[in-house]
Amino acid sequence: MSSQDQQQQQQPAQTQTSTSSSSNNENATTATSSIQQNVVADDSLLCQWEKCSERCPTPEALFDHICEKHVGRKSTNNLNLTCGWNSCRTTTVKRDHITSHIRVHVPLKPHKCEFCGKAFKRPQDLKKHVKTHADDSVLLRTPEQSGGSNGGYRQPGGKVIANLQHLAANPMGYYDHNASMHPGSAGVYGNSHHGGHSGYYAPAHSQQSSYGGGPGYYQMSHNPDLGQHAAWDEKKRNFDNLNDFFGAAKRRQIDAHSYQQVNQRLMQLQGIPIGTGGGISDYIHSAPQLVPIDGHGGHGHGGPMPQHQYSLPLPNLRTKSDLNSIDQFLEQMQSTVYESSNAAAAAGIHQPGAHYTHQALNFRQSHSPPQTHIHNIGSMAPHVSTSYASAPMTATHSSHSVSSGTPALTPPSSSVSYTSGNSPMSSSGMSPISRHSSTSNAAYPNLPAVTLGYSPHHSATAPTSTLGTNFDSDPRRRYSGGVLQRSAGGLNSSQYRESMETSTVGSPTPSPKETTPRPESIVKTEVTNNIDPALSDAGSPSVRSVDTLESARDRAEEAWIENIRVIEALRRYVSDRLQNGEYVKDEEDEDVSMADTDMQDTQVKTEEKPVESLYPVLKTDDDDE
């Protein structure tokens, strides 16, 4: 054998010797540690109560020994409420308290944390410990879905703890409109890629949690939610305003015969969507969106959770008597608004040929003010502006001649004159302004409207317009008016004579003296320029003042028409609730019905009583004969 072979045989022998020596050392160390542990365990399981040195095999046995032998029970007349462990001397008032205190001295820890495996002596200690885990994050994950080293805590058996429903301090769950709090299972919250869905929020890595649990839901905190909350606040204000109005109407805090008070209260309700169903329809348009944060963009959830539409009841409009009372009050308010002479004349209610055309909404041929469902207007497309949707109806007839295109002037021989109450300039303030006399205009000829030549909104059967002032719905040309006399510098002499001849067809031609307006018939205020504004001096102060006056008149007319719309919508809402029975039965009606039933029962019982008297009847000899 060579020297190399001998060296190779010696090396495995040395390796085996070193391995056996190391294993012996390990066994010796293990035995020493086990002996030390047994000694410590024996010391901890030794009863240290006064005058007792009993040794128990387990902590449970030691605890039972102390409770039964040293603490005792009240039923056996040996109850001891003072701790005798070493020199503790803690005194309690109940047996449960002393037994709970004994757990401090006994190495019994039956309450184990399901996250980290740490054991505790008392359940309240475990509850406090679990809260430290819950404070980290309410969004939990499992190691299978995390895919990294941040896996969930594992028990010694290797099972992943993913359920906290048995823990008292469980803050996890999400709110579902169809049910209550759901305990989660197998959710995700970790360092996964952020999906493309814009509605899901990707948490920062510093807030990551590695605890197993259920899916967490965060409320979206993007800028669109700010606008949504603002819309909720606006709807809440509208709801409060409507409820306050019904309350004031029920308590008669509004003078229904005063147009000023009625106008002031109705202006607060303009623009409020008044629907049916117990209050403001779609008061909550949609609940706050709760979106799951699973780290994958939420591709498997199919969009946000379904929301439910509902409407809130009005506290001041609950019973049937409230509905009837408010309906009568609204009828009085409606008659007050309609009977306002200046307002009705300004809107053309008393004009025989007036018909209304609302731009892009509807077409009506009647003498009543326009009626539209306010909630329908409010539910139009978002790109339609509110001012356009709530624009008032405009009368489409005009007082101009078709042939000449000039204003039709009133013959001075007319016996009808303006009074102080119906003068075009007699009204002031925000109240609607009268532009026509309420007396009969049979002496005036009926002239076709100038808008019939080019307006597509008119039909062939539309009634002809009489002399009067209204505005054309066509934005190409707008005629202002109200004054039936010649404007300064508006027409030359030949055009004036032609217009006079056209306006007095079938009647004797007035003399030149009669055609000249008399000074006493001219209103001593600013007159309206009846010619096309494009042909006049736009920079003159008179034109600017006339435009200001016209804009004030327009605002007054719009306010009056909006008041009519609001009243009609309110009455329609109240009548719908009465017809559908959407109210709470009055207690008075129930009391009256119960009283009627009691009266009927009393009458029936009275009739059922026997006719015979309760006392004996003494008969005489005459009665026998």
From Swiss-Prot:
Biased composition (Low complexity): 1-34, 417-438
Biased composition (Polar residues): 391-416, 461-472, 490-514
Membrane-spanning intervals of the chain: none
Induction description: By alkaline conditions.
Name under which the protein is recorded: pH-response transcription factor pacC/RIM101
Family to which the UniProt record says this protein belongs: Belongs to the pacC/RIM101 family.
Alphabetical GO biological process terms: positive regulation of transcription by RNA polymerase II
Gene3D superfamilies assigned: Classic Zinc Finger
SMART domains assigned to the protein according to its UniProt record, in alphabetical order: ZnF_C2H2 (SM00355)
GO CC entries: cytoplasm; nucleus
Location in the cell: Cytoplasm; Nucleus
Gene: pac1
InterPro entries for the chain: pacC/RIM101 (IPR050806), Znf_C2H2_sf (IPR036236), Znf_C2H2_type (IPR013087)
Major localisation: cytoplasm
Annotated Pfam families: zf-C2H2
Positions of short motif YPX[LI] motif 2: 615-618
